[in-house]
């Protein structure tokens, strides 16, 4: 077994309030550094995974410099996913020690429009200019970076323009991702239909033909494979939330639209658990997930929506049962008619 990536939600604190944010927790917290070091040290037996630092806004972690040093002192590579607002702080940390910059594979920047108007409508005033300022800094320091766009009804018309902008400013990669529905996005008609998801995926394939850099569709895209195995299910990606808990995947632990739904996606509290024990529990959960999915397929309840693997997973864990309150929502039919829930 070889784990290729470990994702850490360093904090759920953020300086922005994006319209499409799926993080519903009102309490803020930061990943404990001692637990971070324990995980990094114990993970070496599984190879030398790449470390991904996310949030919230990971640059707001008060001990970011210590965290980066733990990573590089253990000879891991890493990248940071950021909204671009605090990059001067990151650059100062990187410039203080050569290995911090050497082991950094790149910066992933969230972009939600090709224009200031569209981007700032989703992320707030001043966000686009801060993002472009960070791009200028990255280029001046010859640092690799990628753009990540979460596609929704507000920016749907700018998919191609985002690719042109990304290519023009020298990004190394561009990732398109489907948006996770929330009660806020449902109420404001930001969510796309399953048919529009497929149109987005087809458009991304077209865009790949004219850009100078690599263009990718993130996890969650349609697949004809009912037993599709994502990076979680192949055990190539580990994810920890800001509470130092091993979670089933990165899209689940902060997605709390309905607090009454049990947190069945939480595998282990790493404050109290060694990594080996946590991974053993993770393996058991993956086995149960696949077993339940096979039973679900055999039951004849499979729908067209289930071909989107992240949708199926959110449905399995009861994360989108709230859609029953939005009967006209394009993704609500499955929840109203059969309401798959995780087995207790």
Residue ranges and their predicted role:
Residues 24, 122, 233, 313-316:
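Small disulfide-bonded, cysteine-rich extracellular recognition modules and tandem repeats
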Residues 9, 103-112, 117-273:
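Radical SAM enzyme [4Fe-4S]-AdoMet core and its adjacent flexible, acidic
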Residues 25, 55, 111, 178, ...:
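Residues that line or immediately flank small-molecule/substrate-binding pockets and catalytic motifs
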Residues 1-2, 245, 251-344:
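Flexible mid-to-C-terminal extensions adjoining Fe-S/redox cofactors in radical SAM and related proteins
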Residues 14, 18-21, 230, 249-250, ...:
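Short cysteine clusters
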Residues 29, 54-57, 124, 151-152, ...:
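A generic secondary-structure micro-motif detector
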